[in-house]
């Protein structure tokens, strides 16, 4: 398990398709955590790749 992972499900990070790693600090999945990121989002600034419009963001709200 990634020591930087704050995920509560399973023993490893699993963020494909959704942001289950709320802190986005897991090197193994942080790039797929956020579907979108508003300007100034500290979580996504740590490495999340934004894949949608910021007005639909749920992981950095």
From Swiss-Prot:
Residues 1-29 are annotated as: Beta. Metallothioneins have a high content of cysteine residues that bind various heavy metals; these proteins are transcriptionally regulated by both heavy metals and glucocorticoids. Transmembrane segments: none annotated. A divalent metal cation 6 binds at residues 37, 41, 44, 60. A divalent metal cation 3 binds at residues 15, 19, 24, 29. A divalent metal cation 7 binds at residues 50, 57, 59-60. A divalent metal cation 5 binds at residues 34, 36-37, 50. A divalent metal cation 2 binds at residues 7, 13, 15, 26. Residues 30-61 are annotated as: Alpha. This is Metallothionein-1C. One of its GO terms (cellular component) is nucleus. Belongs to the metallothionein superfamily. Type 1 family. Class I metallothioneins contain 2 metal-binding domains: four divalent ions are chelated within cluster A of the alpha domain and are coordinated via cysteinyl thiolate bridges to 11 cysteine ligands. Cluster B, the corresponding region within the beta domain, can ligate three divalent ions to 9 cysteines. A divalent metal cation 1 binds at residues 5, 7, 21, 24. GO terms for molecular function: zinc ion binding. Keywords: Metal-binding, Metal-thiolate cluster. A divalent metal cation 4 binds at residues 33-34, 44, 48. The keyword Metal-binding applies. It comes from Ovis aries. One of its GO terms (biological process) is negative regulation of growth. Pfam families: Metallothio (PF00131).
């Amino acid at each position: 398990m990634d020591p930087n992972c704050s995920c509560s499900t399973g023993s490893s990070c699993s963020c494909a398709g959704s942001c289950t790693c709320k802190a986005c600090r897991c090197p193994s999945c942080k790039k797929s955590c956020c579907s979108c990121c508003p300007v100034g989002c500290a979580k996504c600034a740590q490495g999340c790749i934004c894949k949608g419009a910021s007005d639909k963001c749920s992981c950095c709200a």
